[in-house]
């Protein structure tokens, strides 16, 4: 649902949203595929060739990264299905969407788009006033969708380097949330060297564009292993370029991070 909002898709009238990720189905197992540079165009074409299976449900689909997509349609099926990134036992997808998944797998020798994270939109809770005046800049529908659901501004910028000058310009009018999803993506690809290179590149871009910025907060939103490709349940760091009441090494619950960083005058 969040991703559908970030991609400006129709979620009215209780439409259901489905995340679709490339995956191989074999030996009763779902194996997610993150290395789709050479196959994502043929996978996308195959999905669209069979898309008429969903006719009658007013389907809308948007692809965004290496064969991944968000699908919304008028359907009551909200199945509980396995989620990436780790392999999982195969679970049959119900209804016409299951027909689409099967047809694509048959034509692509086991490769298909498998749905997960299905749901409908609900009204969101109020956010801290200090967090309303923010423009989110990212290539991730997830990050953008969170901002959209909270009433914040958001811009989809696919190229990493392009996000930085856009962020500089937007800082003239609002605060900016600048998001780099590439670090997580390369971890799922199990490519440690590529992950290090992009971190070093981000560091150079920050120095180039924000060396004179006085108030920057760096967040690591979660851990992902570039060896196994799995998410890691670990304590994640954040760091500020300005003084706060937070002591070095102090654990701060997620719901208290913004108040503690911004201070009472910002709430």
Annotate the PLM regions.
Residues 1-267:
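Feature captures the catalytic ectodomains and active-site-proximal regions of enzymes
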